[in-house]
């Protein structure tokens, strides 16, 4: 068994397996101030048009936000007069000067949505999901292209897009996550206009961490 020691610290720093010449390491999360997950649902929405916002997340703080997962789903509660596609996109919004408004605000206060009680509470975030109508857009610069999209076919009432934890964004160890600096955020927007007669509920899931630096 080979041992690698740090020149600046006593004791064993790294073990090397002699059979496979592989390092023995323990994977751990990145160093963060706090780690949170959230799941939420809209009200029963209808008549959404293209680029209506279903979910908005803005980082007010100077600390960066590391986004690990984002997911979306849609359940058709009342069938549309004509069967149609339902689709959503994940967009990065930059240079916020006014947050989106309306809908239901999601507060990350106290221990709400923490992965561990002893972790810090997010410094300053505006997070909200649409109610029975779309959110009202604030002032921000939205990227021209989506980071990801999800779509499904709505022919009858039922599952159109199966709700997922990471079907819009999934960050694995070693990948570079989405980093939201101060006054940057993420939006989940409707990409296909909803036709007559139908309605449904949108579900979102997100996982993120606040760090002192990244």
How does the language model describe each region?
Residues 24-54, 59-68, 73-111, 179-185, ...:
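C-terminal interaction-tip segments
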Residues 18, 26-32, 49-53, 145-149, ...:
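A broad, low-specificity signal for short, low-complexity segments enriched in glycine/proline
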Residues 1-19, 214:
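Short, intrinsically disordered N-terminal pre-domain segments
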Residues 1, 18-21, 103, 121, ...:
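Intrinsic-disorder/low-complexity loop/linker signature
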Residues 1, 43, 163-166:
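Intrinsically disordered, low-complexity segments enriched in polar/charged residues with Gly/Pro
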Residues 13, 43, 98, 133-134, ...:
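N-terminal compositionally biased, intrinsically disordered segments and leader/signal-like regions
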Residues 114-178:
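Extended, solvent-exposed segments with strong compositional bias
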